């Protein structure tokens, strides 16, 4: 049973089918994740599996983290991630990994639907036309210096403020995003690779979280 796995984006390529079709895929390299903690309803109030991935220099590990990794008997990784088991995702005790064990790509299979979470590429400060797909105003016919301005951002005295969440200019990208219901095209257990149909958030080399689809 696939609970989830943390990997890194290695780029995009294509896979050809026997019929000659071309499928664009993202290559995710997911080395075996080391289990640092298994949470249960009795001790933590919910069921989850906490993992780490990658390597980190010992001098870069803080003492609380070093103690946590040492108790689990695993090497310190570049981060800690948690895969929570919801009520609809019931796993028996035999299927749950043990602390100090590992999770690899073998839990996934071709054709399976997954959700991929990553950090989008940062685009810097952007206006509303680029950031929110606002329509630009006229170039002529009385429009002076207001071609790409957003227009009105609210009312007058009532309510006398700008509502929270108003779409305005600001930082674009560099935020957490999830693409749902992507198909696993191929699983390469020997090279720890997942080939996922389509594009996923993030730059090459960034961390990705791959989970079984929640809405499949």
Swiss-Prot record:
The keyword Protein biosynthesis does not apply. GO terms for cellular component: cytosolic large ribosomal subunit. GO terms for molecular function: rRNA binding; structural constituent of ribosome. PANTHER family: 50S RIBOSOMAL PROTEIN L3, LARGE RIBOSOMAL SUBUNIT PROTEIN UL3C. It comes from the Bacteria. Residues 89-108, 139-158 are annotated as: Disordered. The lineage of its organism: Bacteria, Pseudomonadati, Pseudomonadota, Gammaproteobacteria, Chromatiales. Methylated by PrmB. GO terms for biological process: translation. The keyword 4Fe-4S does not apply. One of the primary rRNA binding proteins, it binds directly near the 3'-end of the 23S rRNA, where it nucleates assembly of the 50S subunit. Belongs to the universal ribosomal protein uL3 family. It holds the Pfam family Ribosomal_L3. The gene is rplC. InterPro entries: Ribosomal_uL3 (IPR000597), Ribosomal_uL3_bac/org-type (IPR019927), Ribosomal_uL3_CS (IPR019926), Transl_B-barrel_sf (IPR009000). Part of the 50S ribosomal subunit. Forms a cluster with proteins L14 and L19. Keywords: Methylation, Ribonucleoprotein, Ribosomal protein, RNA-binding, rRNA-binding. It comes from Halorhodospira halophila (strain DSM 244 / SL1). The modification N5-methylglutamine is found at residue 157. This is Large ribosomal subunit protein uL3. NCBIfam families: L3_bact.
């Amino acid at each position: 049973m696939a609970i989830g796995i943390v990997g890194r984006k290695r780029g995009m390529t294509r896979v050809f089918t026997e019929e000659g079709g071309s499928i664009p895929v993202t290559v995710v390299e997911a080395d075996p994740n080391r289990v640092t903690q298994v949470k249960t309803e009795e001790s933590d109030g919910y069921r989850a599996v906490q993992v780490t991935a990658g390597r980190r220099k010992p001098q870069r590990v803080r003492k609380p983290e070093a103690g946590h990794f040492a108790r689990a008997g695993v090497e310190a990784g570049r981060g800690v991630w948690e895969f929570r088991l919801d009520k609809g995702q019931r796993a028996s005790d035999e299927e749950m990994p043990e602390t100090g064990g590992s999770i690899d790509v073998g839990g996934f299979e071709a054709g399976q639907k997954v959700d991929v979470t990553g950090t989008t590429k940062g685009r810097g400060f952007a206006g509303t036309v680029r950031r929110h797909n606002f329509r630009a105003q006229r170039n002529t016919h009385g429009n002076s210096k207001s071609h790409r301005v957003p227009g009105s951002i609210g009312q007058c005295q009532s309510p006398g403020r700008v509502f929270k969440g108003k779409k305005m200019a600001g930082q674009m990208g560099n935020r957490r995003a999830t693409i749902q219901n992507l198909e696993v095209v191929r699983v390469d257990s020997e090279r720890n690779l997942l080939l996922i149909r389509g594009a996923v958030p993030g730059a090459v080399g960034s961390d990705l979280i791959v989970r079984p689809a929640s809405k499949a």
